[in-house]
Amino acid sequence: MQVRFTLPDGMVAFMPWQTLLPETAFAWKSTGAFSHASAEPMRVAGGELDVLTLGPGFDRDSAVRDWIARGASASSRLFGQLPVRRALVIAVPADRAGPGFGMALRGGGPAVVIFLDRHVTRESLANDWTATHELLHLGVPRLPPEDAWLFEGLASYYTEVVRARAGSISPARAYQHLLEGFERGRSNESSLSLRDESSQMHERRSFYRVYWAGAALAFLTDVEARRTSGPTLDSALQAFAACCAASEEDWNAERVLAHLDRSLGAPHFTEQARRWLDRREFPALDGVLRSLGVAPGPRGEAIFGPALNAAIRDAIMAPAPLPAAR
């Protein structure tokens, strides 16, 4: 199949497509843009991003581009580099206050679209985690919506971890954000199991429950892998991204967990999923948090105390170096 665009003078089409389009360009959701603006490739974190800002009045391109670059740099603190060699990132101005809203899509190639307040400033972007979160999604191949607990859980957990590793927030603040997220998920009570809630997340608007219960399972897996002194969840995700982030195959949570557990050398993640996916209760975290010496703090930062696994607590958020160029 050939695709030809006939465009007005000065307008350019921006698509994540390759010269020879894969089947996913037609079978999976994708995004693209038509614009009179130009997009210069951004080399960052060992990869390349084609960054495009759209819309009248959205004239803070350099601030937005710098923010996206920081998000890519932060995500590399997990994967060792940008998890895909090249991706399209589209920033769209919107009438919304607070953090941005984004989506990571795979049809025809990896792409991220982020909707931002059209009046954003460098100061407001400094605390916005959306770019980091969406770029982390690119480290896992496309999964079906019913597996949202896994792909959103991993991204939610590591959004805080990698921002601490990059120095954007302190480890104490990162843990506080995790504790607050876990509490939001716990408070979002449901009569459904996590598995069923994931399948109906959009219909039931149960985002907190699904995102943060999934993040809790990633956290429990991370701590258990470190406690047993084997390979870490970080290293398992790095290996997985290297082989499969850009995969055009159909994946599901069970297959991803099996791959990660092979790298971990033990079924850590699968066991957590089996323990909690078919239950209505939020995953139990109190014992693990006590073993780490982590407790909620009064001023936006968690309180650290002496504990059996304090070294694990510190290692999770320890600074990570920038990646080398590919």
Q: Which residues does each predicted region cover?
A:
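Intrinsically disordered, low-complexity linkers and stems that provide flexible hinges
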Residues: 1-55, 62
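Carboxylate/His-rich catalytic cores and anion/metal-binding grooves
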Residues: 22-27, 75, 83-104, 156-160, ...
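Juxtacatalytic substrate-recognition/specificity segment
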Residues: 40-147
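Soluble non-cytosolic domains of exported or imported proteins
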Residues: 58-70, 121-126, 130, 145, ...
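Acidic/His/Gly-enriched intrinsically disordered linker/tail segments
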Residues: 146-216, 222, 238, 244-247
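Hydrophobic, well-ordered secondary-structure elements that form the walls
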Residues: 155, 218, 231, 260, ...
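Structural helix-adjacent loops and short alpha-helical linkers that scaffold large soluble proteins
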Residues: 165-174, 225-233, 263-270
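Beta/coil-rich, acidic/histidine-enriched accessory regions frequently appended to metallopeptidases
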Residues: 245-326
